[in-house]
Regions:
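ABC family nucleotide-binding domain
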Residues: 8-219
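Basic, Gly/Ser/Thr-rich N-terminal segments that form RNA-phosphate-binding interfaces in CRISPR RAMP
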Residues: 226
Length: 226
């Protein structure tokens, strides 16, 4: 690691166990992970390896059974849920396999929403600008049901980057798309990531996609493996 860089995300001894009938199911075991500012990291593994659970814990969306996560220098699990949500709103963007757009809002309004919640007075102009960056300048007034899957994911990307987050979590962002649409979305993820200088943590089962990241972290049976 370059000495001038700092860890924007640090996990130590992360474990996750859940009840399964009368027994316990171990999902994650003793995960240690550091991510430096500006880095692009892929977390890869087969279905059931624990990668999506790890991402949820790293983002403070789920709580670990053991261990500690620091995001931008803050101990996530020393905060209550409201404080964690406020930290995410300030510093984190998300892109999921399901687009999670609000069906009653237009593309423009979906992207404006986090900007308005953060108090940005230029929300409409900012949202329009980033939708143009993702190739949707002619779709601003369209509702999600009138957009293709690839277009909906582009709106979700624009929304995620609209607040210029320090860290973007992407969980199987092309999982609901055909190959052509998925390739276009992934190109945009990396283009926007470079343009905004955002740190990227990408969860995927796609090895070719993972290799586009600077570093690959592999999970198997809830552990990081070589």
């Amino acid at each position: 690691m370059n000495p001038s860089q700092k860890n924007i995300l640090s996990a130590r001894g992360i474990g996750k166990t859940v009840k399964s009938g009368t027994s316990e199911l171990v999902i994650l075991r003793e995960i240690d992970l550091n991510v430096t500012a500006g880095e692009a990291v892929a977390i890869v593994g087969a279905s059931g390896s624990g990668k999506s659970t790890l991402l949820a814990i790293l983002a403070g969306l789920d709580t670990p059974t053991a261990g500690k996560v620091e995001l931008d220098g803050v101990d996530l699990f020393s905060l209550d849920e409201d404080a964690r949500a406020a930290l995410r709103a300030r510093s984190v963007g998300f892109v999921f396999q399901s687009f999670q757009l609000l069906p009653s809002l237009t593309a423009l309004e979906n992207v404006m929403l986090p900007l308005e919640l953060s108090g940005r007075r230029d929300a409409e102009a900012r949202a329009g600008n980033i939708l143009e960056k993702v190739g949707l300048k002619d779709r601003l007034s369209h509702y999600p049901k009138h957009l293709s899957g690839g277009e909906q994911q582009r709106v979700a990307l624009a929304r995620a980057f609209s607040t210029e987050p320090k860290l973007l979590f992407a969980d199987e962002p092309t999982g609901s798309l055909d190959a052509e649409s998925g390739a276009g979305v992934i190109d945009l993820v990396f283009e926007l990531n470079r343009g905004f200088g955002t740190t990227l943590v990408l969860v995927t089962h796609d090895e070719s996609l993972a290799r586009r990241c600077a570093r690959l972290v592999r999970l198997a049976a809830g552990r990081i493996v070589p």
